[in-house]
Amino acid sequence: MAQGMKRLGMPVAVLLGVVLVGLTATSWLINRDALRQAVEAQIRAVTGLELTVKGPIDVSVFPGSYVSFHDVGLKGGAASDPALRVDVLTANLRLLPLLLQRFEIADLMMLRPQIHVARRADGESNWTPFIETIARTMKPGADNQVSFSEIRIQDGTLDYEDAGNHASEKLEDIDLSLAWPSISRSFAATGQFNWRGERVDGSISISDFVAALSGDRSGLKARLASAPLKLAFDGTVANRTSAMMEGTLTVDTASLRNALQWTGQAPPAGGGFGRFALKARANVVGASIALTNVNVELDGNVAEGVMTYSNNGRQTLQATLAADALDFTPYISTFRLLASGARDWNRQLFDLNSLLTTDLDMRLSAARVTVGPTKLGRTAFGANLRNGALALSVGEAQVYGGIAKGSFGVARSDAIADVKAQFQFLDVDLQACASELFGVNRLSGRGNLNVSLVASGSSPFGLASSLDGTATLTAHDGAISGFNVEQLLKRLERRPLSGGNIRSGSTPFDNLTVSLKFAEGVATTEEVRVEGPASRVTLTGTASVPTREYNLKGVASLTSNGATSFELPFVVEGPWDDPLIYPDPESLIRRSPATAPLLDAVKDKKARDAVRSVLERFTGGGVRPGAPDTAAPAPAPSPAAASEAAKSH
């Protein structure tokens, strides 16, 4: 056996020696100029680009068969600048044809290539000759068919300029492998590159490369994965008059806000825009994308429907979506009407830049909607944003136990927001409605509220200071907390100067009517009437929206069988959330048989101030200062009158 192996090994060794000697001889005898020219001709024939070599050329046949060109440029015939610069372009050769003095490229390797893509306004680019040539040479039966089927790129850069859209991009540190097997019509590219500071893994495969290069329909699969964003497409592509793609599109990101910033888009101001996922059937024509069978998730909100996006000079997004539940709390979490921990309006300036970036036309419907503390039932609304003007319309929303409908608009004028709101609340719970919308916690019952307001300002305080419009409220079967009008009036009817705390209890009402007119941030009462089982209240005066304070006067009346038996003027002053309510002291004094003569008797200022001080202790409230009186002093009150006043107390 060993002897047989020896006999077999000798011929093999001789054969290998002959091959080695032949290769060595070939490497010395081969015409290197002819080899270089053949390689240059093949590259020119395949790419359609002129090859210019400024550096040295290395030729090796054994042990490696290759030709390396240093400082290479490739450009179209009419182009002034090369479309491709390469530090080292290496063409690896096929061994067997080389032994027969035929020079065929097996693959190309580019070290540190600098790729320049310039797209003109007419859609053509400096790479159009390459695409046309390679499409022609890859067709079956072509005269100059592609001899190599793989290109590798190492440490490359790509500069892209789009004259039509005035855009430019740059890819760096490109490591890429492109392959189109000769036994197949397919094309594949896999690799990595850096874009805007992030490493991107990408792959693309085309089922019919020749058809795709010719603009005909071909299968396409593409994947891009990076830290900010993941994207995948599986479908078909064609490019006759414009690029067309149809297939399944999936997008996923942990933060849509970060992904938008990474791609050069300005995210909306405020909060939200975190976790985002989309899967849809996509139809792409040019710069427009139509999405059907959409399943989209944003910040935990899941919806279905259709969407379209276009970027013909200005970004436009249209959508019709339906959801089971929507939560808009994240998007208003950074918006504050009131200053933190204070009763004053927030003076922080609005950020209106997001109104200018995108046009929006969206229709949403949901079974449940949450906006901060507000819970809505079935709701249908639309949002339209065009040329910096935002319009929100609510077709119908179940809220506060009733129905709401109306519109809200914001238009930008430099740094000023012009706001217009028109809303109707029908048969709503007033306690929840007044508390959440206006910060008023003293009203309960059910009613209808109509609001029509306009304002302009650069902050919530600016809006409050310029508020104009009207508001009307009609309510029934409720109560106003803070004081009990009926009990107070009955007590004061018996003892006008009796003291005690009047800021307790609540006043029930059968009907409540409020009509207000706003002008420059001041609300003036046109009609305020409260009708209860045994009392009636009317109010006149103003309320300042910027300072959030009341300045009202009213009359409370006891009623019996429709007739008025006792009336008490009173005053409402102070902040909205904690107003001071007290009866008019002068009216109480006049109603008391014991002290009525005092008010008429006291004429000089010192005596009047002394009496008023005593009366304040009786009433528990303050006496509003009157105009100075210069009349002659009156005689002091009689001892009997003073004794009667003490008994009343």
Tell what function each PLM region has.
Residues P113-Q114, I131-M245, N346-F381, L385:
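Elongated, acidic membrane-bridging lipid-handling scaffolds
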Residues I105, T190, M244-T248, V296, ...:
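Glycine-rich, small/hydroxylated-residue low-complexity segments
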Residues E50, A78-L93, D122, E132, ...:
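Amphipathic hydrophobic-ligand
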Residues M1-G48:
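N-terminal type II signal-anchor transmembrane helix
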Residues H70-L74, A189-N194, L220-S226, T292-V296, ...:
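Short beta-strand segments that buttress and anchor functional surface loops
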Residues L49, Y66, H70-L178, W195, ...:
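Secondary-structure transition motifs
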